[in-house]
Amino acid sequence: MSETLAKFNAISAIRSLIDANGMLIIKTIPGHANSIAVFIDNAGRYEIAGTIAGDDTLLIIPRDKISLSHVHSCLEMSLPGLHKQVGRE
């Protein structure tokens, strides 16, 4: 699968972005959270310490002193168009 197709599939599986006490929760279509977590982890962004994924929910944990707005910017760089399609809660 091409990188562009992988990004499109990741974006289309994301249902919502929720800011939660310095972390970010991503709600997905059931069965997609883990693959999106792997995509984010493989992007290798320093600002993101790690991810934890279940079936339809993904938690992004930023490194110390990294703002959530910076995490959102990192996601937008890795998944262009994410915030336009999904928005934030």
Label for each model-derived stretch:
Residues 81-89:
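Long, charge-dense
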Residues 1-7:
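S4-like RNA-binding module at protein N-termini
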Residues 7-72, 76-78:
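Non-DNA-binding regulatory cores of transcription-related proteins
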